[in-house]
């Protein structure tokens, strides 16, 4: 997104507090004068790594939660209550906001976890190489939490070597990300003669994966590359190419 689009989204959504990754602090500083209703900024770090920022009323995340109780009484409310607001990208004109309910989020998590899609269970280990700002990381953090799966979140380094190091250390069986991430991973695997012994499925979205990449995952690493398609308006998953008996017999 362009800076002008980010400014539009923040103002249109009437955001009051922004949670910012360290890598975006300078960008938000350049936008602050145009942000109409923002009261403060929470930078996702601890006190030792807090940057010297020009942002008004900025605090680090660890300070924010340090004074809060570890106990939380979850309130009762209608399932159609709003849970999150995601904005489209790549559409004509300004981004459009899509408001999700708690009901739609839970139903989407059930669908993503089903046997014909991600097959999420309490024994799963999932590495979503896709950020929450990309349509709630395709809903997989909710699905993983719902079924008690292990979730492994990458940092800002998404090069092939860094992604492989996470895979080697944490042993995920399910990966999720856009094709460019998997191309970088395959390049690293070829250069270092490594394999993906623990991985069963890699879900790819955002754009179509090249046929050669699909074949290389399957033939060299025995990893099924599953295509997912959807839109922001669909929470976002609409359909996925699950492995069929006919495919296995080919």
Model-predicted segments: where are they?
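Phosphate- and divalent-cation-binding pockets in alpha/beta enzyme and binding domains
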Residues: 5, 26-30, 162, 184-185, ...
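Conserved S/T- and glycine-rich ATP-binding loop of Class I adenylate-forming
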Residues: 18, 82, 88-91, 126, ...
